Curated annotation (Swiss-Prot):
<dbReference type="GO" id="GO:0015935">
    <property type="term" value="C:small ribosomal subunit"/>
</dbReference>
<protein>
    <recommendedName>
        <fullName>Small ribosomal subunit protein uS7y</fullName>
    </recommendedName>
</protein>
<feature type="modified residue" description="N-acetylalanine">
    <location>
        <position position="2"/>
    </location>
</feature>
<dbReference type="GO" id="GO:0009506">
    <property type="term" value="C:plasmodesma"/>
</dbReference>
<dbReference type="InterPro" id="IPR036823">
    <property type="entry name" value="Ribosomal_uS7_dom_sf"/>
</dbReference>
<dbReference type="GO" id="GO:0006412">
    <property type="term" value="P:translation"/>
</dbReference>
<dbReference type="GO" id="GO:0022626">
    <property type="term" value="C:cytosolic ribosome"/>
</dbReference>
<dbReference type="GO" id="GO:0003735">
    <property type="term" value="F:structural constituent of ribosome"/>
</dbReference>
<keyword id="KW-0689">Ribosomal protein</keyword>
<dbReference type="Pfam" id="PF00177">
    <property type="entry name" value="Ribosomal_S7"/>
</dbReference>
<dbReference type="InterPro" id="IPR005716">
    <property type="entry name" value="Ribosomal_uS7_euk/arc"/>
</dbReference>
<keyword id="KW-0007">Acetylation</keyword>
<dbReference type="InterPro" id="IPR023798">
    <property type="entry name" value="Ribosomal_uS7_dom"/>
</dbReference>
<dbReference type="GO" id="GO:0000325">
    <property type="term" value="C:plant-type vacuole"/>
</dbReference>
<dbReference type="GO" id="GO:0003729">
    <property type="term" value="F:mRNA binding"/>
</dbReference>
<dbReference type="GO" id="GO:0009505">
    <property type="term" value="C:plant-type cell wall"/>
</dbReference>
<comment type="similarity">
    <text>Belongs to the universal ribosomal protein uS7 family.</text>
</comment>
């Protein structure tokens, strides 16, 4: 029979165990390769390490606070788009979990690292904005802020996965895994990479 000391030792061991996403994927060896996005991809601080991508934080209350949101949770929240999916966080979490398992099987890498690489590669660095009023409107190329790069990357990745899964025998989790792997490689098979290149090409033409 276990003594009180043994129980205390077990509790201490449980407390000292590292936090892993879905109790499988570690945050320790994850790095953000783009120095400009380090502050906007929430993955390296201790507060960003969570077991489940659902912190129930009030990130929309203040400007720029969403940069503090764990990056996997931002991806999860972005899946809850198109009226019929609104508010179905459990469904979105399940999709992300399955997608991460598929990524690990296909690439043998840490899925968190693959997600970060995909976001770094998918964020456009230059865009064209409309300048002028009252009829005379011209496009002008502008640089994109780091936070908007992250926002755009997440939006493009989830949009690509959603469109690929529509009327397709593949599940949304499989399509999300494919999209993330291709985006992490920088492959033009990725919807997000294609859109990013298109945005940058239009901006370059309007310099």
């Amino acid at each position: 029979m276990a003594t009180a000391a043994d129980v205390d030792a077990e509790i201490q061991q449980a407390l000292t165990n590292e936090v892993k996403l879905f109790n499988r994927w570690t945050y320790d060896d994850v790095t953000v390769t783009d120095i400009s996005l380090v502050d906007y991809i929430g993955v390296q601080a201790a507060k960003h390490a969570t077991f489940v991508p659902h912190t129930a934080g009030r990130y929309s209350v203040k400007r720029f606070r969403k940069a503090q949101c764990p990056i996997v949770e931002r991806l999860t929240n972005s899946l809850m788009m198109h009226g019929r999916n609104n508010g179905k966080k459990l469904m979105a979490v399940r999709i992300v979990k399955h997608a991460m398992e598929i990524i690990h099987l296909l690439s043998d890498l840490n899925p968190i690292q693959v997600i970060i690489d995909a976001i770094v590669n998918s964020g456009p660095r230059e865009d064209a904005t409309r300048i002028g009023s009252a009829g005379v409107v011209r496009r002008q190329a502008v640089d994109i802020s780091p936070l908007r790069r992250v926002n755009q990357a997440i939006f493009l990745i989830t949009t690509g996965a959603r469109e690929a899964a529509f009327r397709n025998i593949k599940t949304i989790a499989e399509c999300l895994a494919d999209e993330l792997i291709n985006a992490a490689k920088g492959s033009s098979n990725s919807y997000a990479i294609k859109k990013k290149d298109e945005i940058e090409r239009v901006a370059k033409a309007n310099r």
